Design a protein with these regions (language model features):
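Short amphipathic alpha-helical segments that mediate assembly, nucleic-acid/protein binding
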Residues: 1, 9-13, 38, 68, ...
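N-terminal targeting leaders characterized by basic, low-complexity, disordered sequences
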Residues: 1-35
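Active-site-adjacent loops and short helices of periplasmic peptidoglycan-processing enzymes
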Residues: 15, 89-275, 284-285
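Short, Lys/Arg-rich cytosolic juxtamembrane segment immediately N-terminal
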Residues: 30-46
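Compositionally biased, charge-rich terminal segments
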Residues: 30-34, 64, 74
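Hydrophobic membrane-insertion alpha-helices, especially the h-region
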Residues: 47-63
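Penicillin-recognizing serine hydrolase domain
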Residues: 66-96, 110-134, 236-405
Length: 406
């Protein structure tokens, strides 16, 4: 009996040993399979990394200088001469060079219609002496945001809207259209009076030139000129506003900006950011005629029966800022005011060394304070400004003014 038990014990022990051995072998096979799959995956990742890195290099190279196509071809030949690299890229189709070249050309076309600026490590806030609640300073050459204060927060642009009005109009008329005539209707004047808009002063049924409408829209911020210009271009203000919103889309601003009128009247759906307005001004400055209109200090409309000597109009911002040293020159500007926006303005300044800056501010406490915010910001970021040239005491007293401009 004892020997039988001993034999059974040995058999059980052998059985358990074989099971343990089989389990260990199974685990070893699983581990080996895992290592093989891991090794295979790492090789694939390595090849893919080389592949993607190579393609990225080609794209970066092509976008940096898409005109140097021969250099790209030389790069292709160099890669092909290295079998260990080429073998790692069995799926590379070097037609990607042609595609990259085409995409680079498309990018160049895009640059003609879209503008941008980005923040970097040097982007600053604004000093306490800047009163405006909202603001942004853009370096046009470097495409950087030098300073911002809620620069991408939605605001009511008020009459800064008219920068877009003249830009869209300029892009939708013939080159010889400036001498065309347009008759200002009683309905247009009634719209201006009923909405409390600023006006050039055109009378009912007064016939003026299209050029008068451009200058009248910007210099005195004339709603009569703006609506007349919109009607001349598109047949109605409503149709013209559609063109304005299409232009926002072209500029890449349609997600944060939308317009409902060409004048700048407050509406819940009429909005943009300081950044958006800076990009709109940048596009306008790039248009030769818009730049001319925005930089004109004084203008006299053509003679009409109602105004034989024309109407003398002026750019209020430029005239007030022209004797304030900033280390450069404020070349273009447009102000705005509605209750919801406070005093706001968009301006462009340059110096003789090629520095090009745009400043947009919103919600200042007065028209003079608004201007001095721009002057203060230009003085900080224009490299050539000499503080000894500023009369701080006189400017502080002047800034106490509290008039409003639409």
């Amino acid at each position: 009996m004892y020997s039988i038990r001993l034999e059974l014990g040995r058999e059980l022990e052998d059985h358990l040993f074989r099971r343990m051995q089989a389990k260990e072998e199974e685990e070893e096979r699983a581990a080996q399979e895992y290592r093989q799959k891991k090794s295979w995956l790492l090789r694939k990742i390595g090849k893919l990394s080389i592949h993607l890195g190579f393609l990225a290099g080609i794209l970066i190279f092509a976008f940096a200088d898409h005109s140097s196509y021969e250099k790209l071809k030389a790069l292709e030949e160099e890669i092909a001469a290295r079998p260990f690299i080429y073998d790692a890229l069995p799926l590379v189709d070097f037609r990607v060079l042609d595609e990259a070249r085409e995409e680079a050309a498309q990018l160049e076309e895009l640059k003609k219609t879209q503008y941008y600026a980005v923040e970097n490590d040097d982007t600053a806030g604004m000093d306490e002496e800047v009163i405006s609640k909202y603001g942004i300073v853009i370096d046009m050459n470097e495409n950087t945001i030098l300073a911002t204060r809620e620069g991408k927060t939605r605001i009511s642009p008020a009459s800064m809207t008219k920068i877009m009005t003249v830009l869209v109009a300029a892009e939708n008329i013939a080159e010889d259209a400036l001498e065309d005539k347009f008759t200002v209707t009683p309905e247009i004047n009634y719209y201006c009076y009923s909405h409390g808009c600023s006006k050039v002063g055109f009378e009912d049924n007064e016939t003026v030139t299209v050029a008068d409408l451009f200058y009248g829209t910007i210099l005195p911020s004339g709603a009569d000129a703006a609506i007349s210009l919109a009607t001349y271009v598109a047949g109605s203000q409503e149709a013209f506003v559609d063109l304005m919103n299409q232009k926002l889309e072209t500029l890449g601003l349609s997600e944060t900006a939308h317009f409902t009128n060409c004048v700048g009247l407050y509406a819940e759906d009429h909005y943009c950011t300081c950044y958006d307005m800076a990009m709109i001004l940048r596009a306008a400055v790039a248009n030769p005629f818009c730049r001319e209109v925005l930089s004109t200090r004084k203008y006299t409309t053509t003679s009409t029966d109602q105004h034989p000597n024309g109407i003398e109009i002026s750019n209020w911002f430029l005239r007030r800022a022209e004797d304030k040293p900033i280390g450069g020159t404020i070349t273009c500007a447009k102000t705005g005011f509605v209750k919801e926006s406070g005093n706001c303005a968009a301006s462009y300044a340059t110096d003789d060394k090629g520095c090009d800056l745009i400043v947009v501010t919103g919600m200042s406490t007065s028209s003079w304070r608004c201007i001095y915010d721009h002057i203060s910001l230009y003085r900080k970021y224009m490299p050539g400004f000499d503080p000894s040239t500023a009369d701080s005491a006189a400017e502080t007293a002047e800034a106490e003014g509290d008039d409003e401009d639409n």
